[in-house]
Amino acid sequence: MEIKMFHILIGALLGLLFLATGTRAQFQFFEQMFGGGGHQQQQDHREQNVASDSSWYQRNYDNAHCSDYLCPGTLACVSVPHHCPCQHPDVEDKFELGDGSAICISKGGFKANEAARKVELARKGLL
């Protein structure tokens, strides 16, 4: 009889322990999510995000000095528009069109010049 009571008591204590742990974790979650708990002494030292409108870009564009052509996508200063670099050269290929303009397109698969081949197929209406 004593052993059975001992098991019941241990089970009840473990149940209370799990309940208390879960409740504390839940309150810590809400405290973190909603900034509660009166722990507002800690400050967030992360860098601030850029604005969600075009003000950051416009400010940099307006302050960029270029005597030739200022590329709108990269703010690079080049002699002619089709010399503008791609914004993401690691994942984009630049393809110069015959009319003095250029486009940047996602790099193709595993073959060299695959992106250029796809542009030519598209120009011919085959893609």
UniProtKB/Swiss-Prot annotation:
GO biological process terms held by the UniProt record: ERAD pathway
Signal peptide feature range? 1-25
| Keyword Metal-binding set for record | no
Keywords of the record: Signal
Q: Which domain of life is it from?
A: Eukaryota
UniProt lists the family membership as follows: Belongs to the LCL2 family.
Per its database record, what is this protein's job? Probable component of the endoplasmic reticulum-associated degradation (ERAD) pathway.
Name assigned to this protein = Long chronological lifespan protein 2
Tell me the classification of the organism that encodes this protein.
Answer: Eukaryota, Fungi, Dikarya, Ascomycota, Pezizomycotina
Q: Which gene encodes it?
A: LCL2
